[in-house]
UniProtKB/Swiss-Prot annotation:
All residue ranges annotated as the VPS28 N-terminal domain in the record: 20-127
Sites of N-acetylmethionine modification: M1
PROSITE patterns the UniProt entry points to: VPS28_C, VPS28_N
Function: Component of the endosomal sorting complex required for transport-I (ESCRT-I) complex, a regulator of vesicular trafficking process. The ESCRT-I complex participates in the sorting of membrane proteins into vesicles that bud into late endosomal compartments called multivesicular bodies, and is also involved in the budding of many viruses.
Molecular function GO labels: protein-containing complex binding; ubiquitin binding
Species for this entry: Rattus norvegicus
Keywords for this protein: Acetylation, Cell membrane, Cytoplasm, Endosome, Membrane, Protein transport, Transport
Quaternary assembly: Component of the ESCRT-I complex (endosomal sorting complex required for transport I) which consists of TSG101, VPS28, a VPS37 protein (VPS37A to -D) and MVB12A or MVB12B in a 1:1:1:1 stoichiometry. Interacts with TSG101, VPS37B, VPS37C, MVB12A and MVB12B. Component of an ESCRT-I complex (endosomal sorting complex required for transport I) which consists of TSG101, VPS28, VPS37A and UBAP1 in a 1:1:1:1 stoichiometry. Interacts with VPS36; the interaction mediates the association with the ESCRT-II complex. Interacts with SNF8 and VPS25. Interacts with CEP55.
Organism domain of life: Eukaryota
Protein name per the record: Vacuolar protein sorting-associated protein 28 homolog
Phylogenetic lineage: Eukaryota, Metazoa, Chordata, Craniata, Vertebrata
């Protein structure tokens, strides 16, 4: 009597031990990159640096394709360069000594961004300080620098006033800015406040909060002007 051929699993069939993951609850466990808060911060910092470099690469490509205006590009690139410096300081150490090493380690292929980082200026910037794009880059950088200092609780008069004065002088060099530009008025008012303080005097919590709000508003107004 013909008993037939023993049944065999179909093509692509998996053994029971593989096809039934329910038998292995460990497969559903979350895999964490870190074991403690310090390690988590380390990976967060590396992720921030990675994101900044990728964003800068995308911005460079957008500018090459004429998708952003020179003024918009200059402001955005200047902001990213400031953010890059802050992000890299958080990562730099025994494991990562340079941005080149960081890119090799994480296979980050962003040649346009690397060129911007090494030149430390947007491609629109020339060497002369009277150049419009140089002024735009300096204004963006100084706005961010002062706001970062305040967020880091650096609030002494002699630590804030020099950058704020330079910001004011740079805006004055921009003939394109209208005389009644609100950002210029905001910075001027705070310079007057600081001029009435001694070098060691510090802004109180209320003043820091208000100054941050005012500078953020002025910075946003400057960006709106660039897009107009």
């Amino acid at each position: 009597m013909f008993h037939g051929i023993p049944a065999t699993p179909g093509v692509g069939a998996l053994p029971c031990s593989v096809a039934a993951p329910g038998n292995k609850p460990e497969l559903y466990e979350e895999v964490k990159l870190y074991k403690n808060a310090r390690e988590r911060e380390k990976y967060d910092n590396m992720a921030e640096l990675f994101a900044v470099v990728k964003t800068m690469q995308a911005l460079e490509k957008a500018y090459i394709k004429d998708c952003v205006t020179p003024n918009e590009y200059t402001a955005a690139c200047s902001r990213l360069l400031v953010q890059y410096k802050a992000a890299f300081r958080q990562v730099q150490g025994s494991e990562i000594s340079s941005i080149d090493e960081f890119c090799r380690k994480f296979r980050l292929d962003c040649p346009l961004a690397m060129e911007r980082i090494k030149e430390d200026r947007p491609i629109t910037i020339k060497d002369d300080k009277g150049n419009l794009n140089r002024c735009i880059a300096d204004v963006v950088s100084l706005f961010i620098t002062v706001m970062d200092k305040l967020r880091l609780e650096i609030r002494a008069m002699d630590e804030i006033q020099p950058d704020l004065r330079e910001l004011m002088e740079t805006m004055h060099r921009m003939s394109h800015l209208p005389p009644d530009f609100e950002g210029r008025q905001t910075v001027s008012q705070w310079l007057q406040t600081l001029s009435g303080m001694s070098a060691s005097d510090e802004l109180d919590d209320s003043q820091v909060r208000q100054m941050l709000f005012d500078l953020e508003s002025a910075y946003n107004a400057f960006n709106r002007f660039l897009h107009s």
